[in-house]
Amino acid sequence: MSITKEQVVEFIGNMTVLELSEFIKELEEKFGVSAAAPMAAMAVAAPAGDAAPAEEEKTEFDIILKSAGANKIGVIKVVRALTGLGLKEAKDKVDGAPSTLKEAASKEEAEEAKKQLVEAGAEVEIK
């Protein structure tokens, strides 16, 4: 029984990222090639003219406190809960606004943090 291309594609599609990375390294070693595309080939392969570049969806976000608003104490409490900082450190972050509260947060984490901070009266920006 021979294996079809569809079966190979299905098998590779079910691999985890780590398994796929190891698989690619093994193929590179076995065939003496590199999976990285040369820069010149990438420039030639780029679509020309009116084709708009596809934007990748951002997966990591920075949570930035723009201002504490009127309820500074409530905002400090939320900052402490979100960041795990002590009272003094959280107060310094709030007093030093605009300041980055968290970097490389997931989309869900960033949205939840923004919701909590806005409810406490803060002005927040997600980048």
Swiss-Prot record:
Protein name (Swiss-Prot/TrEMBL): Large ribosomal subunit protein bL12
In the UniProt record, the gene name given for this protein reads rplL
Query: What is stated as this protein's family in its record?
Result: Belongs to the bacterial ribosomal protein bL12 family.
GO cellular component, as recorded: cytosolic large ribosomal subunit
* Molecular function in Gene Ontology: mRNA binding; structural constituent of ribosome
Q: Which InterPro entries match?
A: Ribosomal_bL12, Ribosomal_bL12_C, Ribosomal_bL12_C/ClpS-like, Ribosomal_bL12_oligo, Ribosomal_bL12_oligo_N_sf
- Where is the chain membrane-spanning? none
State the HAMAP family in the record. Answer: Ribosomal_bL12 (MF_00368)
Assembly and interactions? Homodimer. Part of the ribosomal stalk of the 50S ribosomal subunit. Forms a multimeric L10(L12)X complex, where L10 forms an elongated spine to which 2 to 4 L12 dimers bind in a sequential fashion. Binds GTP-bound translation factors.
**CDD domains xref list:** Ribosomal_L7_L12
**Pfam families on file:** Ribosomal_L12, Ribosomal_L12_N
What function does this protein fulfil?
Forms part of the ribosomal stalk which helps the ribosome interact with GTP-bound translation factors. Is thus essential for accurate translation.
Q: Which SUPFAM superfamilies match?
A: ClpS-like, Ribosomal protein L7/12, oligomerisation (N-terminal) domain
**What does the entry give for GO biological process?**
translation
Superkingdom as given in the UniProt entry: Bacteria
Q: Where is this region: Disordered?
A: 94-114
Q: Where is the composition biased (Basic and acidic residues)?
A: 104-114
Query: Which UniProt keywords are present, listed alphabetically?
Result: Ribonucleoprotein, Ribosomal protein
